Amino acid sequence: MTMITDSLAVVLQRRDWENPGVTQLNRLAAHPPFASWRNSEEARTDRPSQQLRSLNGEWRFAWFPAPEAVPESWLECDLPDADTVVVPSNWQMHGYDAPIYTNVTYPITVNPPFVPAENPTGCYSLTFNIDESWLQEGQTRIIFDGVNSAFHLWCNGRWVGYGQDSRLPSEFDLSAFLRAGENRLAVMVLRWSDGSYLEDQDMWRMSGIFRDVSLLHKPTTQISDFQVTTRFNDDFSRAVLEAEVQMYGELRDELRVTVSLWQGETQVASGTAPFGGEIIDERGGYADRVTLRLNVENPELWSAEIPNLYRAVVELHTADGTLIEAEACDVGFREVRIENGLLLLNGKPLLIRGVNRHEHHPLHGQVMDEQTMVQDILLMKQNNFNAVRCSHYPNHPLWYTLCDRYGLYVVDEANIETHGMVPMNRLTDDPRWLPAMSERVTRMVQRDRNHPSVIIWSLGNESGHGANHDALYRWIKSVDPSRPVQYEGGGADTTATDIICPMYARVDEDQPFPAVPKWSIKKWLSLPGEMRPLILCEYAHAMGNSLGGFAKYWQAFRQYPRLQGGFVWDWVDQSLIKYDENGNPWSAYGGDFGDTPNDRQFCMNGLVFADRTPHPALTEAKHQQQFFQFRLSGRTIEVTSEYLFRHSDNEFLHWMVALDGKPLASGEVPLDVGPQGKQLIELPELPQPESAGQLWLTVRVVQPNATAWSEAGHISAWQQWRLAENLSVTLPSASHAIPQLTTSGTDFCIELGNKRWQFNRQSGFLSQMWIGDEKQLLTPLRDQFTRAPLDNDIGVSEATRIDPNAWVERWKAAGHYQAEAALLQCTADTLADAVLITTAHAWQHQGKTLFISRKTYRIDGHGEMVINVDVAVASDTPHPARVGLTCQLAQVAERVNWLGLGPQENYPDRLTAACFDRWDLPLSDMYTPYVFPSENGLRCGTRELNYGPHQWRGDFQFNISRYSQQQLMETSHRHLLHAEEGTWLNIDGFHMGIGGDDSWSPSVSAEFQLSAGHYHYQLVWCQK
């Protein structure tokens, strides 16, 4: 044990937090989570241990701008102005200091290992009583599961130790410091340390004791470590559970270890042995270790599909059977290996349906509770995710237990990122930083290696490629050859990774960056000598309204076996709740706390909002990742299961044929399909309607019974096909009414019954409509070529740093947002049964014509206005965001009804999950509340839209809400939006894709750009 004087002054003088060679003082060795049961039955059933006591709750807290400002007296007693805070928590969430959101740029001046003199410091203290029996025998430990960034610990005024690495436990022996009666802990937490240079992850930078604190009482002679490994014969019919157990304390001949394996109430296998390890070298073996091997016949294998778990109980006892203590863990029998270029689980090639997940809570910052963790897992499973990458640090220890039990594959990632360094490997190639990096990797492995859900180790994130990575890769491969190692830094295919694991590589497009090119994922597989599997560690940047082009990745994954999936970036928006002057909550992002530097809304890349409400893009991910694929041939549906281990036992296929959303026939068939098997389902003779309309066949896989992660009736997969329709002609009914045209000085007016239309002859726009005496428009019907920019449109552009290649900057520079209409033509003609208005406009900016729009409006005796639009696009202007029409309707109706793709928001490059049907939703549901406002709520493939008294027909896309595109563009946060008068309607003949391969370069695929020189579309607008 390191002995240091107890005084605060001496500790401050040492400045351990600015010494990369000091990562801890007196911290105990890493190990799996312990509970030290004194009853083996309690260990088997995972009951709360009487030897494990939580110290979570109210602590006293005082904040100082620097450690030097902390008074020495604090070591002995609480300060008079100390506050009360809850542990675990981030102190920034309690009003102390400010959270900082930055992606790449370090929040402190880069001068490793030194940190600013102004180093916010939190002083925590807790007074508690100890069980007196704990003082008489054994060892009492204190466990801090997570403290950011570094801390010194005192107990009863005496210095205990020091720890850093905010994402792994720091555990200390308190036995020599405790006394009968009251005891006082004092924890001095520093916001910045040399460890901060290894923690430059894309997240909020927060501080404090943010994970659990607990006391653990172990016997003097104790289990100090244990590791379980499963091994198999070739066909997995026989397995061996290998348990290596290590003890600490007095090594006595009478000591024995028993390892028993349980499946529920049934003991499957058991073995007992004394200590004395196998021969290691010419000097012998470890005297304090023993390895037991238990044979298991026909083990029930673990996978994310069927997470079968056993329970291993490790007992330390004397020869006569007296139990000293027991530890235990869940065991999953599974094997991970790479063979012939494929990542295999239990001999089957995995397809990773993965997502990156930060530990984030909108109210509690980086504090995770069990309810939130379970909620995340349930949502992931319900949306067909089978894997999660712990980006970019080891998670709360409970997370892995939950992933074991519910079934998720885990990439466990070391808490190492040096993204802001120049070059990025400045520290990771420096031997002075090897000890710090080594502790972050080795301690992660030692804590988490017993979890079956952990199938891959990761050396960290975005830290370049250095010699330290190579050393740590070799260490992991030596101590745990049962798992592959991945690491993206240095080009994603270095010698420090078993898996090609690029981030944001495109499907077909190379990105030839200097030194570290990103090849297309298809090309990467074919590079000379390359035989590793490729799994994207990050792809499909889900920032705001995004995930366009997601289907293209999944087409490639299913086409090329060695393309084994990837991890979407990312799971949850990292917005934080703030409150306005009236106490109303709102969602904040970078810069909203006065934090500098900051990267604005780049912290919000989630498939779900911070409160776990899904983004529309989540449905697209669910559909593309679904485990059942379908093919229609005639009346036969071929259902293919992509499950590797699971036989369908809780699924029905529900099918329905509908004409324009009206059901004509339906049925239900139980699915009986084995792993990777097929089932043919013959449908009855399908109806052939005589009336016009779109005929669609929809199939849905429904789970009738609830599961551990879904409710009864859960829909896990679906598909639609448009069927051939009989030709039919609907003749228009005769009308004896003829609309009347009148001309005034400024307007053409058309009247039919109680309806009137007014076209302004000077502007050439439809300026007003009346039904009776009620005006229908608040603004004229005008062309629209722009959208409130998406995050993907903005890219890396900021007010002080413009990226001219970003879509929004191209549109601004070309004048798309400032274009004004010059009238070229506005005429009116009376036909035999209708009135025809003809207009033409040149949309210009600074004398340059960008678009020419020609329209005809034909108003007939039925009151229907047929609008034909022809748009010519200048050859030298950027591709427009949309080609459509917009106006502000006077009505605010409660609901919107449409026949088209839905129900969720969808865009041309993100619509495979949408279904054609007749949908009816509240107006409020047509708006997607992205925290950073942007274009939203589009519905594609629309044939009919009904809102208030109005109906539109044609083949178009639309969005409808209380917010104009201008307000969306000019507003920084959703809570600042105000409902405008009436309702804004945008009807597009054509709309550009949204992109999403990444959010910092123009990522809309060419096929979804509006690159043509001419566009034509037609609408029918009438009143019901």
From Swiss-Prot:
Chain coiled-coil ranges: none
One Pfam family from the record: LacZ_4
Transmembrane helix listed as a keyword: no
Binding positions (substrate): 103, 202, 462, 538-541, 605, 1000
Positions annotated to bind Mg(2+) 1: 417, 419, 462
Record NCBIfam families: PRK09525.1
Identification of the protein by name: Beta-galactosidase
Species name: Escherichia coli O6:K15:H31 (strain 536 / UPEC)
Gene that this polypeptide is encoded by: lacZ
